[in-house]
């Protein structure tokens, strides 16, 4: 689902997204009762940095006051931002880049890399289910069957499949303090780092994979 001009949506509309993003279900309550539906989707959103759109621009000055910018950005709550794994600032594109005739990496190559990473994840969780065996706890096995990709991992799977070396643990410890990461953000960063490692074809999460995952977090949002 793509939401353009994210701050222009009403606060109640945006806050309703928190449950389906986190739990992949949506609950509707009416006088006659409550119904729960599956809501497994990928959220992509875009927004300007301020109402005029030029806050932080290197060429055109912003015409908004500091208070206006703060009020505009606060339309999106910290808990909602905390549930979005990848935050990217898109600066003005220079003429030289727009007119460059060199082609980037072909989409077919990117697609193949993603498909390989997803296959790696499916095999990882299939092996985990097989290791339980028929005598494993039935409830746990049913939950495991729902996991097909890194995004579906719960804390137990994160601890098993997202282990860090000493350098990675030191980096994560510093990031928890400097970026004020919540417990939710901690697990989301590790899952994203595991995906970055899978895309690189790496068996273990390297510090570089973790550093890339951390740079996608919004600054100052801890949940």
Tell me the role of every PLM-derived stretch:
Residues 1-2, 88:
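Hydrophobic positions in the central parallel beta-sheet of the AAA+
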Residues 12-223:
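Basic, amphipathic alpha-helical bundle interface domains used for macromolecular binding and assembly
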Residues 4-5, 16:
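Walker B catalytic acidic pair
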């Amino acid at each position: 689902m793509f939401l353009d001009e994210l701050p222009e949506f009403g606060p109640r509309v945006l806050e309703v997204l928190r449950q389906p993003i986190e739990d992949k279900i949506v609950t509707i309550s009416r006088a006659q009762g409550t119904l729960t539906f599956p809501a497994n989707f990928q959220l992509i959103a875009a927004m300007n940095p301020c109402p005029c759109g030029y806050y932080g621009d290197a060429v055109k000055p912003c015409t908004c006051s500091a208070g206006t910018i703060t009020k505009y950005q606060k339309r999106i709550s910290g808990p909602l931002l905390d549930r979005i794994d990848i935050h990217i600032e898109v600066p003005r594109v220079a003429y030289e880049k727009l007119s460059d005739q060199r082609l980037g990496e072909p989409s077919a190559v990117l697609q193949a890399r993603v498909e390989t990473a997803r296959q790696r994840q499916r095999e990882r969780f299939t092996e985990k289910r097989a290791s339980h065996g028929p005598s494993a706890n039935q409830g746990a096995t049913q939950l495991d069957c729902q996991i097909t990709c890194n995004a579906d991992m719960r804390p137990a799977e994160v601890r098993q499949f997202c282990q860090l070396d000493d350098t990675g643990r030191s980096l994560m410890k510093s990031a928890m303090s400097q970026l004020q990461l919540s417990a939710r953000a901690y697990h989301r960063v590790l899952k994203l780092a595991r995906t970055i490692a899978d895309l690189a074809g790496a068996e273990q999460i390297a510090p570089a994979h973790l550093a890339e995952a951390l740079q996608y977090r919004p600054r100052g949002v801890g949940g």
